[in-house]
Amino acid sequence: MTATKTIEVALSTSGLGPDGRPIRIPLGAEGLTGAPPGLEPELEGEHMLINIGPQHPATHGVLRLVLELDGETVVRCIPHVGYLHCGFEKIGEYRQYNQIIPWTDREDYLNSMGNNVAFVLGAERLFGVEITERCRVLRVIAMELSRIISHLVWLGTTCIDIGAFTPFLWCFQERENVYKLLEGWTGARLTTSGTRVGGMIADVPDGWTDGLRAFLRGFPKTLDQVDAMLTRNAIWVGRTVGLGVMTPDEALNYGLSGPMLRASGVAYDVRKDFPYLGYETYDFDVPVGTNGDVYDRFLVRFEELRQSVRILEQALARLPDGPVNIDDPRLILPPKHKATSEMESMIHHFKLVMEGPRPPIGETYVPIESPKGEKGYYFVSDGTAKPVRWRIRPPSYVNLSAIPRMVEGHLLSDVIAINASIDIVMGEIDR
């Protein structure tokens, strides 16, 4: 990297220069030459430096890993992120609460409904409202379907990375079945924007639950097929056992969560330890590993797929009748037929859309158990319709921070499997 590139410049928002253009401020100190500290390591002896990414199929996004190698052994790893930065948190400060929901789709786009639910849980705590029982159960269904989607994509793409093709096809076929269910409910497959503060975008249509039951009858058979092909497969075991080991203490010290933490033997699950949406009333197990390696992360996520099926079956059995949205004119729009026929409802609709609901002054943090770990949203309200601060706690970002420790001492070919086992989405990391 040249000094010219290192001493890059940024556009300042502080003012304009004499020529009417934004003032440029150097990012580096005056006189700085070469790469900033830690960007490119000083090589020792005959060590070699290589890049994986930011454009590489096995990084599953614009992630760059700078690796220092001694032969084929990784001596050091420096992850580079930020290529996909969009400024979600800053944008949220200029949007009403319901207007922020579409941005949550685009963080971890494999868990869009889960992000939607997590966001409105935090907003509803800020507003001090209680949702209906039907909405509560539907949100559990939405979150577990998103967990299944995310784990299926992880499993299928990890199989591709390691060299197994058939399970990839099985996983993506089942993923397509779930997307059809979400599309029938929200009208969208990937970026659903399915929730609203105080409820959902819509109730499930007639016959939708029958489709979910049909999926739950067939999905376990696919899991059995994948289990038979992978779990005791000598090649799969040889490519995953003993790689990227994290002890329980290391996992906790790095702040890992989700399957990454549970694979190391720590039974922490937000659904059990800090229940929300009535998860404490559902009968399901939290799978825990013992070795903290790539193989245990596979086992934990695979078993979580079966546990999600259990939760969904229980949710369907207890899904009550009744409204999906709360009856609160501060938050919920009037019915469409009233908004187009009654002047009062039309005015109510206009003011709520244009001005937005206003929570009381305060702050709150709400975590959920996303497919990748503890996903949290922090809000600060000054009593206006837009949050003063909206902070995202992205599990992918925290989990990725441990990759230098996990790949150290392993072969270059093992880096791909270790990176895949973290299960990252760059939209969530860079935000």
Per-region residue spans from a language model:
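Metal/cofactor-centered catalytic core regions of large enzymes
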Residues: 2-431
